[in-house]
Amino acid sequence: THEALVDRVMDSNDQERERGITILAKAASVHWKGVKINLVDTPGHADFGGEVERALAMVDGVLLLVDAAEGPLPQTRYVLQKAVAADLPAIVVLNKVDRADARPEEVLDEIYQLFMDLEVPDHHIEFPVISAVAREGRACEGVGMPAPDATLAPLLDAVLKTVLAPIGDPAAPL
Protein backbone atom coordinates (compact mmCIF):
# COMPACT_ATOMS: atom_id res chain seq x y z
CA THR A 1 0.00 0.00 0.00
CA HIS A 2 0.96 3.63 -0.35
CA GLU A 3 1.03 4.00 3.45
CA ALA A 4 3.46 1.11 3.85
CA LEU A 5 5.70 2.59 1.15
CA VAL A 6 5.77 5.99 2.84
CA ASP A 7 6.52 4.43 6.23
CA ARG A 8 9.60 2.68 4.83
CA VAL A 9 10.84 5.09 2.16
CA MET A 10 14.16 5.54 3.98
CA ASP A 11 14.57 1.76 4.43
CA SER A 12 14.48 0.78 0.77
CA ASN A 13 17.05 -2.01 0.89
CA ASP A 14 15.53 -5.51 1.41
CA GLN A 15 17.95 -6.30 4.23
CA GLU A 16 17.09 -3.00 5.95
CA ARG A 17 13.38 -3.75 5.87
CA GLU A 18 13.95 -7.30 7.07
CA ARG A 19 16.26 -6.35 9.96
CA GLY A 20 14.64 -3.01 10.80
CA ILE A 21 17.95 -1.15 10.67
CA THR A 22 19.62 1.37 8.38
CA ILE A 23 22.56 0.02 6.40
CA LEU A 24 22.89 2.49 3.53
CA ALA A 25 22.71 6.26 4.01
CA LYS A 26 19.74 7.83 2.24
CA ALA A 27 18.57 11.39 1.73
CA ALA A 28 15.18 13.07 1.63
CA SER A 29 14.16 16.72 1.49
CA VAL A 30 11.37 18.70 3.07
CA HIS A 31 10.45 22.35 2.55
CA TRP A 32 9.71 24.18 5.80
CA LYS A 33 9.04 27.90 6.19
CA GLY A 34 10.65 28.68 2.86
CA VAL A 35 13.77 26.60 3.56
CA LYS A 36 14.71 23.31 1.96
CA ILE A 37 15.89 20.93 4.69
CA ASN A 38 17.85 17.93 3.47
CA LEU A 39 17.69 14.94 5.80
CA VAL A 40 20.17 12.08 5.65
CA ASP A 41 19.39 8.82 7.44
CA THR A 42 22.62 7.06 8.38
CA PRO A 43 23.38 3.71 9.90
CA GLY A 44 24.27 3.93 13.55
CA HIS A 45 26.35 0.80 13.85
CA ALA A 46 30.15 1.05 13.71
CA ASP A 47 29.98 -1.91 11.28
CA PHE A 48 28.74 0.59 8.71
CA GLY A 49 31.19 3.33 9.71
CA GLY A 50 32.07 4.28 6.15
CA GLU A 51 28.44 5.17 5.47
CA VAL A 52 28.29 7.23 8.68
CA GLU A 53 31.44 9.16 7.85
CA ARG A 54 30.35 9.86 4.26
CA ALA A 55 26.98 11.13 5.46
CA LEU A 56 28.45 13.32 8.20
CA ALA A 57 30.74 14.95 5.63
CA MET A 58 27.63 16.14 3.76
CA VAL A 59 25.57 17.61 6.61
CA ASP A 60 25.59 20.73 8.76
CA GLY A 61 24.00 19.24 11.91
CA VAL A 62 22.66 16.01 13.40
CA LEU A 63 19.44 14.72 14.87
CA LEU A 64 20.61 12.35 17.61
CA LEU A 65 17.62 10.00 17.69
CA VAL A 66 17.44 8.00 20.93
CA ASP A 67 14.74 5.53 21.98
CA ALA A 68 13.08 6.90 25.15
CA ALA A 69 12.99 3.41 26.68
CA GLU A 70 16.29 1.90 25.52
CA GLY A 71 18.43 4.99 25.97
CA PRO A 72 21.76 5.58 24.25
CA LEU A 73 23.20 2.46 22.62
CA PRO A 74 26.82 1.81 21.56
CA GLN A 75 26.00 3.12 18.10
CA THR A 76 24.72 6.37 19.68
CA ARG A 77 28.16 6.86 21.20
CA TYR A 78 29.86 6.06 17.88
CA VAL A 79 27.80 8.50 15.81
CA LEU A 80 28.01 11.23 18.47
CA GLN A 81 31.82 10.91 18.55
CA LYS A 82 31.96 11.33 14.79
CA ALA A 83 29.51 14.27 14.80
CA VAL A 84 31.43 16.09 17.54
CA ALA A 85 34.73 15.47 15.73
CA ALA A 86 33.14 17.17 12.70
CA ASP A 87 31.93 20.02 14.99
CA LEU A 88 28.29 19.44 14.00
CA PRO A 89 25.54 20.81 16.27
CA ALA A 90 23.14 18.21 17.65
CA ILE A 91 19.42 18.18 18.29
CA VAL A 92 18.51 15.37 20.69
CA VAL A 93 15.29 13.60 19.74
CA LEU A 94 13.77 11.34 22.39
CA ASN A 95 11.71 9.00 20.24
CA LYS A 96 8.96 6.55 21.21
CA VAL A 97 7.99 8.56 24.30
CA ASP A 98 4.59 6.86 24.08
CA ARG A 99 5.98 3.43 24.96
CA ALA A 100 4.76 2.02 28.28
CA ASP A 101 8.38 1.54 29.37
CA ALA A 102 9.54 5.00 28.21
CA ARG A 103 11.73 6.84 30.70
CA PRO A 104 12.55 10.08 28.87
CA GLU A 105 13.94 12.01 31.86
CA GLU A 106 16.38 9.20 32.74
CA VAL A 107 17.34 8.74 29.10
CA LEU A 108 18.06 12.45 28.75
CA ASP A 109 20.31 12.20 31.84
CA GLU A 110 22.08 9.26 30.16
CA ILE A 111 22.56 11.35 27.03
CA TYR A 112 24.07 14.20 29.06
CA GLN A 113 26.34 11.65 30.73
CA LEU A 114 27.39 10.35 27.32
CA PHE A 115 28.31 13.89 26.25
CA MET A 116 30.35 14.25 29.47
CA ASP A 117 32.03 10.83 29.04
CA LEU A 118 33.10 11.84 25.55
CA GLU A 119 34.47 15.12 26.94
CA VAL A 120 32.41 17.04 24.41
CA PRO A 121 33.19 20.79 24.23
CA ASP A 122 30.72 22.92 26.19
CA HIS A 123 29.13 24.48 23.10
CA HIS A 124 27.91 21.01 22.04
CA ILE A 125 26.16 20.35 25.37
CA GLU A 126 23.70 23.21 24.85
CA PHE A 127 21.46 21.14 22.56
CA PRO A 128 17.72 21.42 22.03
CA VAL A 129 15.61 18.45 23.13
CA ILE A 130 12.58 17.22 21.19
CA SER A 131 10.24 14.45 22.34
CA ALA A 132 8.61 12.47 19.56
CA VAL A 133 6.36 9.68 18.47
CA ALA A 134 7.95 9.58 15.03
CA ARG A 135 5.82 6.81 13.56
CA GLU A 136 2.78 9.07 14.12
CA GLY A 137 4.56 12.27 13.01
CA ARG A 138 4.18 13.99 16.41
CA ALA A 139 6.75 16.01 18.35
CA CYS A 140 7.04 18.61 21.10
CA GLU A 141 9.82 20.72 22.58
CA GLY A 142 11.55 19.44 25.70
CA VAL A 143 10.77 16.27 27.60
CA GLY A 144 7.10 15.40 27.36
CA MET A 145 4.34 13.74 25.40
CA PRO A 146 3.36 15.36 22.09
CA ALA A 147 -0.32 16.29 21.93
CA PRO A 148 -2.55 13.99 19.88
CA ASP A 149 -2.83 16.68 17.18
CA ALA A 150 0.87 17.61 17.27
CA THR A 151 2.98 17.63 14.12
CA LEU A 152 6.71 17.56 13.46
CA ALA A 153 6.77 21.38 13.44
CA PRO A 154 8.79 21.61 16.70
CA LEU A 155 11.46 19.34 15.23
CA LEU A 156 11.68 21.24 11.94
CA ASP A 157 11.74 24.57 13.82
CA ALA A 158 14.61 23.24 15.95
CA VAL A 159 16.52 22.37 12.79
CA LEU A 160 16.08 25.92 11.46
CA LYS A 161 17.20 27.43 14.79
CA THR A 162 20.13 25.10 15.45
CA VAL A 163 21.66 24.16 12.11
CA LEU A 164 23.34 26.98 10.23
CA ALA A 165 22.74 27.28 6.52
CA PRO A 166 25.63 26.14 4.34
CA ILE A 167 28.17 28.81 3.50
CA GLY A 168 29.24 29.34 -0.07
CA ASP A 169 28.39 30.85 -3.39
CA PRO A 170 26.01 28.62 -5.35
CA ALA A 171 27.10 30.40 -8.53
CA ALA A 172 30.79 29.67 -7.92
CA PRO A 173 32.45 26.92 -9.95
CA LEU A 174 32.72 23.55 -8.27
Locate each region found by the language model.
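Hydrophobic face of alpha-helices
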Residues: 49, 73, 108, 152-160
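P-loop NTPase switch module centered on the Walker A-proximal segment
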Residues: 1-66, 106, 110
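Conserved catalytic-core segments of large NTP-driven translation/proteostasis enzymes
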Residues: 115-174
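Conserved C-terminal guanine-recognition region of P-loop GTPase G domains, centered on the G4
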Residues: 56, 61-124
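A short, flexible beta-alpha/helix-coil linker loop
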Residues: 45-46, 97, 135-139
